[in-house]
């Protein structure tokens, strides 16, 4: 069998694609691990994060922490984990299940010096001042700090004490070097095995007595703890000792739990805010109801009455009525192609692509096929589905372009394939340079960039062309009415129908429909918390679709009645302007985090812009098609001589 170059290239690209797809979907409740008594287990370390900087780092980038004796081994990570800055690695924090409870162990070995110099102490002090939290994993469960909400994962790297007259910068910083680990387990009496159903850490600070000529020979037992139970300060002041003796120690205790293995994630998603979600949904449903009544009045009462009038016998009374109604008077211009038709068709294609990605992801999430245990699975699913939805982008972009009487559909296809992905990739690449300069774990390695580019040009672009090809072969739908050769002049508009004002007014209601849920999403995103209430989010998405469609229909009808036939772009921008409010809110939300660093602000501005751009394409496309079907319906229902 002869294999040509095209088959080899396709096989390579398909392998890259499958490598990122593998594992993002799972069936809840599968693949538990049964621990036997005495079985050795190990904790895996991940990243450290801060809500005040938004710049994650690898755990082993912390100065003074002990690396594993066997060397650092990275877990295989999916695309979403890499983009989110997760770097899961092995550690020497081990345990023998149910047999070593309460025993204090030392991590430091002969190769891991307990002496931390002044320069490294300054780094630790900075991390504690910025309230960095440490993220670990055990049996796929993220660690949570004892006494904290489970939705707020990780444990404190250290803490500060503020004396009177001190600021955060001058406060004493203490390092949490001793960890009290609690493993919750559910026993299976039939085979004397157990499953881990919970993982907590209570971090404390211990100033151990200095051991001279350290050789790592303390054994497993912790050395003597100071009689006054002093805490380990990492704050370095002039005239004081410029180094610290730091031992990393831990102890494990085991607690039986009635929680079943397939319910162990429930505690991470418990929320006291369900009433807020329901209030938001009910409030949005009231808006939808009001808009639905308005649309019904327009279609049933006004339009049907007008259509019956126009299709009746042409009397002088009818002619007078026709002159009073504006939307029929612009029938010769209403299907005139808009300005910049290619740009609008590209926006529509991108909007359909984002809509498809969002809807399919939400369906999988609601059905439970996106695993919370698979870190980065949701982000990977979004990227993969965005790539696969490129075919819809090509099809609908070309379809709209041919409706606009466009001829160069191949050029339109190229713009569709490169515009939205290119903007996102360009912003991401620019931000990544700063993250790489900061040595953050969120900096994407070259290999991942190569994979993204391969997926873009090897899968997404061909799918766009494939969709465009199918669309170009379909006949162009005929307009219900003929377009005049000379454009009709638009009369002066009343103040509230000013294009800029009406567009800005139209975006308020779609934004209002998602406002509350947006707050929870941003809190989850920037506070490194869990967000998994996709049932509420799916309802909000449906409300957003209906709201965007109905507000666009209402505003479009008012525009046509005002004899303004430039409705193509306005139908897209009316609902799409909600993204402006989203961007303003997202940027202002950052002030709540108290961030002042340039890179952190750049991250917020860039990611808020990407999110708002996608939201504009999504809502704008919904508004466009709603108005398009309305206009075709009403003008195909009347007879024009």
From Swiss-Prot:
A GO BP annotation: phagocytosis
Please list which residues make up the signal peptide.
Answer: 1-23
Please provide the record's keywords in A-Z order: Membrane, Receptor, Signal, Transmembrane, Transmembrane helix
Q: Which InterPro entries match?
A: EMP70, MFS_trans_sf
Instruction: Show which residues sit on the Extracellular side of the membrane.
Output: 24-279, 371-374, 435-445, 524-532, 600-608
Question: Where does this one sit in the cell?
Answer: Membrane
GO terms for molecular function, please?
Answer: transmembrane signaling receptor activity
Q: Which Pfam families match?
A: EMP70
Membrane among keywords: yes
Residue runs in coiled coils: none
Give the residue spans that cross the bilayer.
Answer: 280-300, 350-370, 375-395, 414-434, 446-466, 503-523, 533-553, 579-599, 609-629
PANTHER family (alphabetical): TRANSMEMBRANE 9 SUPERFAMILY MEMBER 2 (PTHR10766:SF111), TRANSMEMBRANE 9 SUPERFAMILY PROTEIN (PTHR10766)
| Family to which this protein belongs | Belongs to the nonaspanin (TM9SF) (TC 9.A.2) family.
Which function does this protein serve? Involved in adhesion, phagocytosis of hydrophilic particles and intracellular killing of bacteria. Associates with proteins harboring glycine-rich transmembrane domains and ensures their efficient localization to the cell surface.
- The molecule here is called Putative phagocytic receptor 1a
Q: Source organism lineage? A: Eukaryota, Amoebozoa, Evosea, Eumycetozoa, Dictyostelia
Which gene holds the coding sequence for this protein?
Answer: phg1a
């Amino acid at each position: 069998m002869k294999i040509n170059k095209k088959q080899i290239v396709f096989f390579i690209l398909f392998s890259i694609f499958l490598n990122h797809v593998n594992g993002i979907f799972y069936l809840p409740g599968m693949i538990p691990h049964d621990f036997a008594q005495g079985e050795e287990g190990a904790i895996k370390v991940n990243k450290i994060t801060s809500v005040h900087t938004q710049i994650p780092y690898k755990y082993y980038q912390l100065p003074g922490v002990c690396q594993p004796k066997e060397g650092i081994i990275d877990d295989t990570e999916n695309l979403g984990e890499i983009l989110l800055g997760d770097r899961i690695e092995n550690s020497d924090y081990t345990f023998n299940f149910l047999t070593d409870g309460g025993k204090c162990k030392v991590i430091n070995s002969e190769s891991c010096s307990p002496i931390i110099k002044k320069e490294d102490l300054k780094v630790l002090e900075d991390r504690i001042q910025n309230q960095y939290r440490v993220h670990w994993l055990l049996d796929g469960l993220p660690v949570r700090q004892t006494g904290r909400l489970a939705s707020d994962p990780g444990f404190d790297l250290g803490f500060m004490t503020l004396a009177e007259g001190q600021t955060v910068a001058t406060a004493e910083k203490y390092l949490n070097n001793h960890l009290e680990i609690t493993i919750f387990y559910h026993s299976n009496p039939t085979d004397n095995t157990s499953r881990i159903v919970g993982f907590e850490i209570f971090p404390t600070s211990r100033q151990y007595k200095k051991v001279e000529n350290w050789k790592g020979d303390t054994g497993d037992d912790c050395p003597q703890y100071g009689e006054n139970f002093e805490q380990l300060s990492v704050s370095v002041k002039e005239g004081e000792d410029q180094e610290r003796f730091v031992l990393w120690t831990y102890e494990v205790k085991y607690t039986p739990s009635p929680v079943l293995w397939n319910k162990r994630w429930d505690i991470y998603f418990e929320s006291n805010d369900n009433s807020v979600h329901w209030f938001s949904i009910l409030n949005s449903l009231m808006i939808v109801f009001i808009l639905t009544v308005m649309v019904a009045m327009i279609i049933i009462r006004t339009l049907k009455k007008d259509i019956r009038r126009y299709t009746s016998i042409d009397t002088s009374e009818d002619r007078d009525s026709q002159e009073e109604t504006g939307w029929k008077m612009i029938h010769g211009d209403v299907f005139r192609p808009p300005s910049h038709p290619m740009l609008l068709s590209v926006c529509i294609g991108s909007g359909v692509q984002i809509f498809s990605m969002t809807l399919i992801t939400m369906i999988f999430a609601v059905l439970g096929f996106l695993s919370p245990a698979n870190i980065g699975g949701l982000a990977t699913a979004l990227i993969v589905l965005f790539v696969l939805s490129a075919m819809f982008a090509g099809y609908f972009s070309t379809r709209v372009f041919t409706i606009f009487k466009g001829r160069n559909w191949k050029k339109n296809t190229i713009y569709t394939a490169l515009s939205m992905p290119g903007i996102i990739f360009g912003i991401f690449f620019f931000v990544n340079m700063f993250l790489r300069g900061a040595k953050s774990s969120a900096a994407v390695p070259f290999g991942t960039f190569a994979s993204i580019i391969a997926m873009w040009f090897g899968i997404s672009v061909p799918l766009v062309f494939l969709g465009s090809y199918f669309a170009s072969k379909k006949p162009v739908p005929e307009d219900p009415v003929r377009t005049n050769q000379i454009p009709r002049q638009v009369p002066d508009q009343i103040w509230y129908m000013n294009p800029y004002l009406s567009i800005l007014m139209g975006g308020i209601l779609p934004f209002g429909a998602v406002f509350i849920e947006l707050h929870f999403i941003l809190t989850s995103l920037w506070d490194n918390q869990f967000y998994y209430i996709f049932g509420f989010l799916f309802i909000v998405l449906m409300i957003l679709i209906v709201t965007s469609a109905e507000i666009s229909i209402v505003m479009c009808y008012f525009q046509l009645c005002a004899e303004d036939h430039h409705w193509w772009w306005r139908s897209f921008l009316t609902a799409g302007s909600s993204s402006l409010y989203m961007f303003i809110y997202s940027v202002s939300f950052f002030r709540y985090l108290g961030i002042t660093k340039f890179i952190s602000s750049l991250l917020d501005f860039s990611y808020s812009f990407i999110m708002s751009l996608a939201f504009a394409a999504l809502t704008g496309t919904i508004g466009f098609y709603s108005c398009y079907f309305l206009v075709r319906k009403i003008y195909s229902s009347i007879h024009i001589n």
